[in-house]
C-alpha cells in the first residue's frame, strides 16, 4: 500500500492562517474584526 502524502501539517497551517499570523498584517486584522462582528466562534484555524 502507498502512504497518504497529502496530510497537511498543523504547524504550517498555524503559521499561515493562525491568530498571530492574522494580527501581523492590517488586512489580517480586518479578517479577525469581520469574523468577530459576524459572531464566529472560531476566529482562526
Swiss-Prot record:
Disulfide bonds: none
Pfam families in the cross-refs: Ribosomal_L34 (PF00468)
Biased composition (Basic residues): 11-25, 33-45
UniProt keyword Phosphoprotein present: no
Superkingdom, natural source: Bacteria
Keyword Kinase: no
Coiled coil: none
GO cellular component, one term: ribosome
GO molecular-function terms, A-Z: structural constituent of ribosome
Region (Disordered): 1-45
Keywords recorded for this protein, A-Z: Ribonucleoprotein, Ribosomal protein
Biological process, per Gene Ontology: translation
HAMAP family: Ribosomal_bL34
Family to which this protein belongs: Belongs to the bacterial ribosomal protein bL34 family.
Descriptive protein name: Large ribosomal subunit protein bL34
GN (gene name): rpmH
Amino acid at each position: 500500500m502507498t502512504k497518504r502524502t497529502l496530510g497537511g501539517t498543523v504547524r504550517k497551517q498555524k503559521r499561515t492562517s493562525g491568530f498571530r499570523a492574522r494580527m501581523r498584517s492590517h488586512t489580517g486584522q480586518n479578517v479577525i474584526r469581520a469574523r468577530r462582528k459576524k459572531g464566529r466562534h472560531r476566529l482562526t484555524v
